[in-house]
Amino acid sequence: MKTPPVLKRRREGVTDYRKRYRLVISRETRAVIRQTRKGLIIQLVDYVPEGDHVLVTVTNKTLKKALNIDGNNIQMYYLAGYMAAKKGISLGISGAVVDTGRAIFRKGGRIAAAIKGLIDGGLEINADEDIFPDESRLNGEHLKQRLDINEIKSKIGE
């Protein structure tokens, strides 16, 4: 018997098909969080057999155009998650499961901040409170150029 071929996306380390299968069979909207070299991408995605259907996309460029803020830190990930949740709720999405892909998830890190933003924005996501960054880090007390999170959240909510 011949060994089955290894799929290209698995060989390149892009897709974990076991994890993707478990997420897809849940039949819930996925909150896809991806880190790039210079920014982030947060998408709310539904599975259809022909291919995934992207409902909402928020990137660091979206935040820069809409709110004139820039960066690649915990505050930006939190605000991007918050904005994605608000856009998703306006489309009738109430909850999601988190899809971090092959990214290494760290307690209190940027991905955790994005999940916190999704939850604070109103999406129902099953996550433990221990993984989120402290409020002081979300408010940017560790940064030289911090953002006023509450002011920006009120702009997003409008």
Swiss-Prot record:
BP GO terms, sorted: ribosomal large subunit assembly; translation
GO cellular component: cytosolic large ribosomal subunit
Keywords associated with the record: Ribonucleoprotein, Ribosomal protein, RNA-binding, rRNA-binding
Gene3D superfamilies: 3.30.420.100
CDD domains (UniProt xref): Ribosomal_L18_L5e
Keyword presence, tRNA processing: no
Positions in coiled-coil regions: none
InterPro entries associated with the record: Rbsml_uL18_euk
MF term (GO), any: 5S rRNA binding
Free-text function comment from the UniProt entry: This is one of the proteins that bind and probably mediate the attachment of the 5S RNA into the large ribosomal subunit, where it forms part of the central protuberance.
Stored PANTHER family: LARGE RIBOSOMAL SUBUNIT PROTEIN UL18, RIBOSOMAL PROTEIN L5-RELATED
Subunit structure of this chain's protein: Part of the 50S ribosomal subunit. Contacts the 5S and 23S rRNAs.
Family: Belongs to the universal ribosomal protein uL18 family.
Protein name: Large ribosomal subunit protein uL18
